Structures are given as C-alpha cells and as structure tokens.
Amino acid sequence: MVLVTAVRDYINRMIQDISGMKVLILDSSTVSIVSVVYSQSDLLKKEVFLVELVDSISMSKEPMSHLKAVYFLRPTSENIQHLKRQLASPRFGECHLFFSNILNDTQIHILADLDEHEAVLQVQEFYADFVAGDPCHFSLNISSNHLYMLPVAMDPSNLQHYCDRIVDGISAVFLALKRRPIIRYQRTSDIAKRIAQDTAKLMYQQESGLFDFRRSETLLLVLDRREDAVTPLLNQWTYQAMVHELIGIQDNKVDLRTFGKVPKDQQEVVLSSEQDSFFKANMYENFGDIGMNIKRMVDEFQQIAKSNQKIQTIEDMAKFVDNYPEYRRKQGNVSKHVTLVTEMSKIVEERKLMLVSQTEQELACNGGQGAAFEAVTTLLNNENVSDIDRLRLVMLYALRYEKESPVQLMQLFNKLASKSAKYKPGLVQFLLKQAGVDKRTGDLFGNRDLLNIARNMARGLKGVENVYTQHQPLLTQTMESISKGRLRDIDYPYVGNHFQPGRPQDVVIFIVGGTTYEESRSVALFNSTNSGIRFILGGTTILNSKRFLKDLEDAQRMIRSSSTVV
C-alpha cells in the first residue's frame, strides 16, 4: 500500500513497454507527479531522451518522426484541446496516450474522432493523479488552496472546480490501491461533507463497476484543516518539516538560489527518502541529532582523507566540505545536508527562533494563561523577532485563550498593530472566525476531555525529551481513536448506508486545506508501531506557516472585496 511504488509502477508500464527512443509529454500537474518518483537518469535508462510540456510542444512544428511520443496528462478539457491540435498534424512516429484519471464518454469520442492519421497506438487510464512525495503522504498541489475557507455562494464555479479536483485525486488514490473505502467526514465542516458525499457518489454510483474491489476493510476520513490551525502555525524542529518551514520544499526539491554562497551544484537539491539514504534515515530526527549524524559521516571521511582539521561546529563542517572537492563527489548527499543545516542554523539565529519556539510550544501544549501572556508580550517587544513570528505568536495565543482572556487578547492585538508593519490584527480575527473554538469539534489543546487532561499532566510530570518538539498534531489523537475503534459516529458520520463494524486495515485521511510534514511524521511513526492499521495522509497541498498565512490572507481579501455577508 505504498503510494510511491504504485505511481512508479504506472510510469514503468508507460515507458518500459514502448521500445525505442521516446519523448515524454506532460502537463503542469503530471510533471510534478512524475518528478517525485522518477529521476532524470531513471528516464534516460528507459530511452526517454526528451521531456516536454504539452502546452509548449503545441507551439512547435518541427517533425520528430524518429521519436515515439508518450503522453501522460490529466483528462482536462485544456489537454484534450492540446491533443486536438497536435494530432491534426502529428510530429512523432507514434503517439501513446495515458491519462492520470477516468476519461468521460465525451472525451473518449473526441479522441477517437481526432486520430485521422492513425498515429495513436493506445489510450489508457493510469490512476496516478496525485503527487506521492513520501510512501504514505500525498498532495494534490492545488494552487488556489484558500477556496475551502470561502462561503459557498461567493465563488460557486471555482469552488466546484476545487472540489472536483479533490474528488479526482482521492478516487485515483483508491484506484491505485485497488480499494473502495467506507467514507466518513468531519461533521462541523460543510466542505468535508461535500467532498465525502461527491466521492461516495462517484465510487458507489457513477463508477461503481470500476471500484468493484472485493476488499472493503478500508476507511476514507475527510477532515478540514481549520479543525487544527495550530500545527501549520508552529516552527518545526525535525529535519524534513524544518526544511519546509524555513526554506521550502516543492515536489521534494529545495531551491537554495536566494541563499548567499551556496555551491553551484547545490542551488537546487533533492530531498527524497527514495533516492537519499541519509535523508531517509534522518528525515524525522530532531535538528540537534541531524548535526551530530552529519558530523559522524564527515569524521569518517576525515579519517580516510587523513585530515587533522578540527570539526566542532556546523561552520567547520561547511569549510571541510569546501576544502575537499573529492568528498563532495563521493558524499554528495552529505555535503548537501551540510549546506541545508548551515543555512537553517543562520535563520534560527537571525530570527531568534529558539526563543520564539519555546513560547509557541508552551502555547500549544501547556496551560498557564498569565505566563503565556507575559511571554508573548515580551517577544512582541523584542526588536529581533520578525513580523511573521510576532503574528504567529498572537495567533497561537488567540486560538488557545480567545474565550478565557479577551481583554489581554485585545492588548496583544494593539501591540501587534504598533509593532508589525506588514500584519494587522484583522488577520488574527479572521483566523478565529475560520478556526476558533466555536468552529472546532475535537479537543485541540487537550483541555476538554478528562483523559486528554490526564495524559497531558502525565507527560508534564515525566518531562519531555525535547522542549521544541512537545507538540503532537490533533491528527495523532484521531489515529489513536481509529485504531481503538473509538472514532465517534456523531462527530465523524458515515456517508450513505456503508458502515464499518470492526477496525479498518487501511485508512486514508484527507485534509481539505492541506497537510503538514509534522503530521506526515506522526503518520510514519504510527505506522511503525505495527498496530495492524496502515495510515496514509493526503491533502490539497503541503503547508508551512508562510503558505497557511497566505491562504488566510487570500481568503480574507476575497471575502472583504465581496458584498457577501459572512
């Protein structure tokens, strides 16, 4: 049930069975789908000598009859139009058409009519309509991710398109896994309900034959990001999550071009658990351990190189790697990780993130409103704290104490307004309208449910291994409830008459509004406990705090510019 393997198998079947020199033609979505599971060198081994985008190849007229064209596209009307133009005067010796999802009858008829020159040798559906960045974590890379926060009446056409894309992605995941799930959703979310119902309609009515798989011990749970707005607001201190938070990961690639003196061969680096054994072993480790593990590998090479250079700091490691070009050649991966850790250390120091993060974790995990107010006020007054960190601190305080301390919250709003040029308190108030206590179902701060209160007290008494990684996403509680058969029907209703009496074997949790790498780490750790249930996490995009705040701003701007009353 590993998604990376499923997507890789589809691509293998596309390019392996077609012999000879090939051009692979993709669209803006499938280029991401392919790039996270297949490297350029992998493609060359399969005789793929050219990779082109379908919209740019439409503009070229140069004949290439020596190449066989392998198209892998989403079945959209735009792509059908591109094919219409290209098949009218074929440039390639053969055309093989693969679509990442279900073609409708109209599209099939259009394609049949287009092929006047009989250039098309096959048309197939290969259900890889999602970006499988990690074995149990996928994204749909939806750019207009803020739409889930809008009232239905505001932009019905774009919202429909947004929901359709999500249903397409979810259905492709289950077709790739050869499962038809029982479907549940978060009761307090209209958009989660809509997507759950649309998915059920597709799987149990419109395409019931296609989804007629025997095994049914599978659950799809559709959640809303606003149920836990804390997780995407926090600074991160485990490797993969920290890289995404401080630098950014897009399709398993990290762009370092804007960072000072980065070596040319490391301006863009790949972070893939499938292609990088060091990253695979360390992606969920905390920042301090990463530094030690890199140092251990540098020490090993130092012995081989018989160098006496003292290595005690991250800067020492960076200098050592620069001085030994053969080290970079032999241990390219390690020098890449030295670069990443070096750049992140600079950001941590510049933004005083150890100070900021300690207060964030206190806000997310522990009580004590008075102490929290003092700590946030002190940081708002600290000139070294950035505007984005000030905003996140006020948001975290507001999510936790909106009902308990409205007077102090107003004082923090005023302080934020005077200290931050970019961010205003209106965005915090908008967050509370979207994700405040009145909108939530679950026990986000572990202070409603008696069992959660006891658990938090026990954790406090035992002490926490790392003050910066105390927080656990709400998703962890949800997975525990599912594994114990205690996910409440009243909070997470079933769609239709399809119920699940026992525990599911496989669970796909889809978060409308996006996932985080902290949550994907929780899923991976949960899967490693051998509980008998395999979890997969998916979402509309992969968030860091910057992206989450941008989505909030985009939604707020649209609502303000509309005359619709929220």
Feature map (PLM): residue ranges:
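Extended, well-folded catalytic/binding cores that form a central cleft or groove in large enzyme
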Residues: 1-566
